């Protein structure tokens, strides 16, 4: 594949780069990895049953490595457009610090390592879901959907929604309605989150030909879709309470967070088309990250509280 270099310092295939450990760590997309690790850990905590702490740690490390591997493969394939977009031009490959072939090998080795170790140490169901997640993100989303359809992140968002299901499967060796709800919370959250970003990064996406919804369908359609997905996310966020694997108290917290999420999305909907500052979109993007962390934190706190009460007979 062709890699564009804005700095004239492209590291060519076949040549050893002078990459640092920090460059390879950046290749793993640590910010994305942190969200993956957090939601996978939530799946471990929320699942009924017990997993040995050592196996739990191994599971989380394998999921983190698998997420990092898919990030490396994504950066390898997207290096040509990363070089053009302002927010990605300084990534290791387009900046010439890591050769594309090194990034590809790094991602493939980590992918295989994470899946095999998770299967051998924990169970093969969780390893299979992890393998499918890596494939879905690196191949289905990155190589196919991202550059071919404005629904790229709607379908591709499934890759980011699997971690809590993997964590759940590590404990139970099963996929259940409860773990599917955890999947759906992230799956439905993804469009509003990324389309908010796409609104204030429209020019970048247009420059590289990635058909994000605002560029293809326009701002107004995108804003309608953001509100719709925010509502769906808020509704799905309270389902754990209705399905009985979270308390009424959690439901109130989730409802409040969902109401704020919807409010922020409506602020984006009311934003005039062509607004250059895009402040409501930036606020929604920031709050959406907080929302996801807050919902899964509330679920874990609720679960730990119920375990405490069941073991002690009450708070006092």
UniProtKB/Swiss-Prot annotation:
Catalytic activity, as annotated: heme b + (2E,6E)-farnesyl diphosphate + H2O = Fe(II)-heme o + diphosphate
Major localisation: membrane
Keywords noted in UniProt: Cell inner membrane, Cell membrane, Heme biosynthesis, Membrane, Transferase, Transmembrane, Transmembrane helix
Pfam families: UbiA
UniProt cross-references to InterPro entries, sorted A to Z: Protohaem_IX_farnesylTrfase, UbiA_prenyltransferase, UbiA_prenylTrfase_CS, UbiA_sf
Keyword Cell membrane recorded: yes
Class in the EC hierarchy, top level: transferase
PROSITE patterns, A to Z: UBIA
Pathway: Porphyrin-containing compound metabolism; heme O biosynthesis; heme O from protoheme: step 1/1
Record GO biological process: heme O biosynthetic process
Cellular component annotations (GO), alphabetically ordered: plasma membrane
Subcellular location: Cell inner membrane
TM spans (from-to): 32-52, 53-73, 93-113, 116-136, 152-172, 180-200, 221-241, 252-271, 289-309
MF terms (GO), sorted A to Z: protoheme IX farnesyltransferase activity
EC number: 2.5.1.141
Keyword Cell inner membrane: yes
Membrane topology recorded in Swiss-Prot or TrEMBL: Multi-pass membrane protein
Additional detail: Carbon 2 of the heme B porphyrin ring is defined according to the Fischer nomenclature.
Protein family membership: Belongs to the UbiA prenyltransferase family. Protoheme IX farnesyltransferase subfamily.
Purpose of the protein: Converts heme B (protoheme IX) to heme O by substitution of the vinyl group on carbon 2 of heme B porphyrin ring with a hydroxyethyl farnesyl side group.
Record protein name field: Protoheme IX farnesyltransferase
Organism name: Rhizobium leguminosarum bv. trifolii (strain WSM2304)
Lineage: Bacteria, Pseudomonadati, Pseudomonadota, Alphaproteobacteria, Hyphomicrobiales
